[in-house]
Every structure is written in C-alpha cells, then in structure tokens.
Amino acid sequence: MEDLNVVDSINGAGSWLVANQALLLSYAVNIVAALAIIIVGLIIARMISNAVNRLMISRKIDATVADFLSALVRYGIIAFTLIAALGRVGVQTASVIAVLGAAGLAVGLALQGSLSNLAAGVLLVMFRPFRAGEYVDLGGVAGTVLSVQIFSTTMRTADGKIIVIPNGKIIAGNIINFSREPVRRNEFIIGVAYDSDIDQVKQILTNIIQSEDRILKDREMTVRLNELGASSINFVVRVWSNSGDLQNVYWDVLERIKREFDAAGISFPYPQMDVNFKRVKEDKAA
C-alpha cells in the first residue's frame, strides 16, 4: 500500500512538473538573468569606482576623500544593480524603493548636520577654494590649512593652535585665501601734525619705498594725502610685494618711516580735542 502511495506521489509530481514546465522555465531564466545582472553590476561598479579613484588621485585630491567618494559611487551602483535584479525575478521594486527612501529620509533627518558637512566637504574638494599648506581666513579664523577631510578642515593658527572647523560652517561663511595670489598689496596710513610740510612728507615716503628692494617697482606705488583727520593729516601709502615678503615688508617700512620722520622733525600727533568754555553772565535780580 505504501509503495502505491509513493508511486502516486511521484506520478503526481511528474504531472505537476509537466503541467508547469513553462512556468518553471520562466523562473529559471529569470533567476539566471538576475544572477547575471548582479555579476555584471558588481564588475561595472568596481571598474567605475577604480576609475573615479584614479581620476581624483591624479588631480591631487586627498586620498581619504578620493576613497570615500569612489566607495560612494561603487555602493550606489550596487544598490541599483540589486534593485534591477529583484525586479527581474518579479519582486515589486516600487515598494522596495519606497522603503529605502523612507529609511534614507529618517537617516537624513537624524544626521542632517553630518550630511551638511559631507556635502560641504564634497564642494570644497570639487572647487578647491584652498589647499593644504595655504594661509586662509575661514569665517574669521586665520591659519595655515593642514588637511581638508570629508567632514571637517584642520588648520594651524599663527600662535600654534590646531583648529578643526566643520565644513558646513566654512561653506556658509567667507573664505579669504592669502596664498593663492603670488603678489599682494600693503597699505600704510600715516598721520602727521597739521603744521608738517606736505611735500617733505611725500618725498620722504617716496624715498623709503623706492629704496626697499622687496617692493615691486613694476606695480603701481601710491603716496597721497588721503584725509584731513581730527588730529592729523593722513597720508596713504600703497605698495606691492611678493606674498612671502608681505609681512616683513610692512614691519620694516613702518620702522623706517618712524626713524626718517624723527630725523626730519616730523611729529606724529596724539589725538586731541579743543574745548572752549563760554562764560554766561547771571541775570541780576530786579
């Protein structure tokens, strides 16, 4: 009896296979196609990821940033590949995409600060407003850039402090790069007493800047009376020099101005104010 049941089961299974042969063949083809999609997608993801990494390294982009962005490209391609494979075997990909979208939204809301810094880091890498080794002012913080990472930028101030600034704050503020241009301009505002001889002051200032070798003579040099101030007449001196010489030129020229003016008897007045008193006579009693 049991032998008959086994035979009947085998016959039933055979009949079902024959009846559903087309359906099984279709499923088999879809599964093989899905596997092929996954294999090809993984190969393409690796090739494109490596190409992106090499491209960014060739453009001297930080290795950490290059690795992160290339990995982001790779996993993005893999995600699309898996969705395509699921669709090939009959899974409703619309619901999968909806779930992934909801999960991504939740993660984005939870990490919006970090994602903002990430997006800002990508923009800094793409547009390169500053590079490691350059002296910059980032939102009021000045120093030498040590590294530009995905989420933050590290810099050293002139007094030796190490400061880490989130990239989101950098993008939202002003970026001043002091190192990008090879030459820069110094400006001096020199105030002298009102009884000083204007021509003598201009001649001394002109001689000082003409004799300074680090000042670029092929650039415009300005020595002009700029303002009649409350306590002094103010001259403006504008000169150009190489960026590396800028600060030393400023200090040395300022010292020479003081020495030359002292030798010529030209004084630098202190802020002063004239106060006039007016006597008011009291009315006599009637």
Curated annotation (Swiss-Prot):
UniProt subcellular location: Cell inner membrane
Periplasmic topological domain: 1-30, 89-90
Impact after mutating V40 to D/K: Normal growth stops, without cell death, due to increased membrane permeability to potassium ions and protons (permeability tested only for D substitutions)
Taxonomy, superkingdom: Bacteria
Main subcellular location of this protein, as a coarse class: membrane
Keyword Transmembrane: yes
An individual GO BP term: monoatomic ion transmembrane transport
UniProt topology in membrane: Multi-pass membrane protein
Record keywords: Cell inner membrane, Cell membrane, Ion channel, Ion transport, Membrane, Transmembrane, Transmembrane helix, Transport
Domain notes from UniProt: The channel pore is formed by TM3 and the loop between TM2 and TM3. After a sharp turn at Gly-113, an alpha-helix (residues 114-127) is oriented nearly parallel to the plane of the putative lipid bilayer. On the intracellular side of the channel, the permeation pathway of MscS does not connect directly to the cytoplasm but instead opens to a large chamber that is connected to the cytoplasm. This chamber resembles a molecular filter that could serve to prescreen large molecules before they are allowed passage to the transmembrane pore.
Record function comment: Mechanosensitive channel that participates in the regulation of osmotic pressure changes within the cell, opening in response to stretch forces in the membrane lipid bilayer, without the need for other proteins. Contributes to normal resistance to hypoosmotic shock. Forms an ion channel of 1.0 nanosiemens conductance with a slight preference for anions. The channel is sensitive to voltage; as the membrane is depolarized, less tension is required to open the channel and vice versa. The channel is characterized by short bursts of activity that last for a few seconds.
Family under the similarity heading: Belongs to the MscS (TC 1.A.23) family.
Protein name (Swiss-Prot/TrEMBL): Small-conductance mechanosensitive channel
Naturally occurring in which organism (per UniProt): Escherichia coli (strain K12)
Lineage: Bacteria, Pseudomonadati, Pseudomonadota, Gammaproteobacteria, Enterobacterales
Gene, per the UniProt record: mscS
